[in-house]
Amino acid sequence: MEKISYGGWKNCYHLSNDHIELIVTADVGPRIIYLGLIGGENIFMQFPDQMGVTTSDEWLNFGGHRLWHAPESQPRTYYPDMEPVLVQEIDHGLVVTQKPEPTTGVQKQIQIALSPNEPEVKLIHRLINHNLWGVEAAPWSISVMSPGGIAILPLPPRGPHPEFILPTSRISIWPYTNLSDPRFKFFEKYIQITQDAAM
C-alpha cells in the first residue's frame, strides 16, 4: 500500500497484489475510484471534468464505487461527499470513514480488504448513526462501471417444486425500469446486465 496522487486528487491510496490494484480517494469520499487487473484498464467509470474536484455547490458523481443510504431521497441521499475522509490502515487494506453528515447525522464507512494472493477484494459498508434518535436506512453500495462491461449477478441455487416453495430472490423494480431493455438477460443461474450507454 502506498499514498499517491491520482486524477488531480493529491491524497489517494494505492493497494495492489499480484493480480489487481485499486485506488481510494482520501480528499473526497469514501470512494474507490479505480479497480482493475495489474496493467489493465479501470473497470470503473470516471468523469474527466470531475476528477480532482473537492468543492462544488452540487453533488457530483465522480464515478467509481461509493456508499449511499437508502431509500433514495432528495436531498438526503445526494449529500455531497466532498470532504476529506479519515483513512485507517488495516491488514491488507483500509477503513475509510467520512465525517458525519451535518444534514443527516449519518456517517459512511467502507472497509476494504484486498486478498494477499487472489484477484479479490472484500468490502464492508457501514452507516453509523450519530443522532440521538433512530434512523431507518440501509447501506446502498453503488459502482459506476466503464462502458462495455458485463455484470453477472449469480442467483441462489435452484430447487425442485414442491420441496422449495419459498422465494430465494428479490428484484426491485422502479417506475422507470424497463425489463424489455436488451441490456438485461435472464438465465437460470444468473442475470446478466451489459453496460451500454447507447441503448
Placement of each model-derived feature along the sequence:
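Surface-exposed acidic/polar loop and edge beta-strand patches at domain peripheries
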Residues: 1-199
